[in-house]
Structure formats: structure tokens, C-alpha cells
């Protein structure tokens, strides 16, 4: 064995000194199998496009899972912060969460172990009921412990990276933290009982929101059907004296002006021919003669 290591043959291997090793390290040369590898051999060992695509898919899937985990932790943190913002009491004489008065005249109180605040029994949670001395926690501290347990903060000694849910309504990722969609206020149909104002006019009920044509037709019909001598509820003159439709009904249908002018001219011609002077001149009618 000694001859093998310290032999005098020319082909025997000798361990290089530190200087040579440092020089070979700078020149990237050595006794490795990859030292004298050619460029063609290196290209032949490169990844194929299918392998690159598979690796990229694995990386993208890991990134998506990481984002989902951050969103899940963000929802837990948002819920905890919402509970902290909604406190109503001071934790001394009032319940920290609901603000109920504590003491002899109020409800019984318990002492939270973590935040050292007083809460009522409804807002407190008994953490260790099996022990002789019960351990009480408020809902905020209990939720904080739950966040540390479910987010892995107990392992990392702190809350990991998270993404808070969006504040825009309807854009939150989780339905429990998504605010209710704001629906546009629908215009309620106007009730006919409340929107219509009925007035007693001319013996019948007339709606104020009816069309003007229906009002005119109904009023003209009432004028025709109302007997003469009945007084108008809005005026003092009887219906027969108001020059309304009663006289027109008594006198019958009116004739056109052309027909009247024609009949008057014919009547005048007949009268003129009967009383005309034989000499051709018009004859004047004399008035009643007085006593001679």
C-alpha cells in the first residue's frame, strides 16, 4: 500500500499542493468528469420544452397556492380586526364587547386572562373548564388564539404574510366577509287609494288624475242630463239660465249659418212679391193708424 501511494513510478498519482488546487479552481479545471465536457455534450443534456413547461406549471401552481393561503390568513386577520373595532365598553365597569354595565346591579363579569379586561359571561369563553380554577377569555382573545393556530403563527413566532380582502362591495373573496350587494331602491308603485284625490263634483265621483278628455266628456254628459232649475254647486245661477246645453237641447240641433241666410232671403223675397207696388216700387208698411 505504501508503494502504491509513495511509489517512484511515473504513472503514479501525486496529490497536488494547495497552490495548484487554487489555480485549477480559478481556471475551472480539475479531475472532474465534467471538466473537459464539450459544448455539444452540454447542449445534449439541456431540458426539453416539455420538461420546461412541466417545471413552470409546478412553479405557477405553487404560487397560486401561496396566494390562496395568504388570502385565507388575510380573512382571519380581517375578522379579528373587525371584532376589535366593534368594541362598545371600557372593560372596567362595562363589558368590553357589548357595553353592558357590570357589578351588583348589573350582570356578572369574568376576567380575561390575555387582555386583562372584564367581560360579561355571554361575551366570555371558558377556555379550560376541566381545571379547578376556570380560565376565561374574551371573544377577541379567543379569536386571536384561533388566528395564531390556523395561520401557523405559533410556528413562525408571528403572523405570516397575508392579503386582506378587498374593500370594494361585492369584490371580497369569501362570502362571509363579502358585504351585502347594494340593491337599487325600487320605486314603489303608487297606490290608487293614496295617490288619487276624489272630489264630489256634479253628483258623481271624478278622479283628479284622470285625463282632461274624460273630464270634459263626463261634465258635458252631466250638463245634458241635469234638469233645468238645478243650481250649480259652484255657482248661483240655475243650469237652465247659464246659457248652457239645456237651451240648446230645447231648441233642437243648430243649423248652419248658410242655411239660415238662405231661408231668410227666400222669406224676404216672398214677402216682397206679395206686398210690392204694382208700379214696381217697393211698398212700405204703414204703422197702425190712430183714430181720425
UniProtKB/Swiss-Prot annotation:
Which segments show compositional bias classed as Low complexity? Answer: 257-269
Quote the subcellular location field of this record: Cytoplasm; Cytoplasmic vesicle, Secretory vesicle membrane
List all Basic and acidic residues biased stretches. Answer: 221-235
Region listing for Disordered, in residue ranges:
175-292
Question: Which parts of the sequence belong to the RabBD domain?
Answer: 41-158
Tell me the GO BP annotations in alphabetical order.
calcium-dependent activation of synaptic vesicle fusion; intracellular protein transport; positive regulation of calcium ion-dependent exocytosis
Give the principal location in a single coarse category.
cytoplasm
What PROSITE patterns does the annotation carry?
RABBD, ZF_FYVE
**Subunit composition and interactions:** Recruited to dense-core vesicles through specific interaction with RAB27A in endocrine cells. Interacts with RAB3A, RAB3B, RAB3C and RAB3D. Interacts with ZYX.
List the protein's name.
Rab effector Noc2
Q: Which organism is it from?
A: Bos taurus (Bovine)
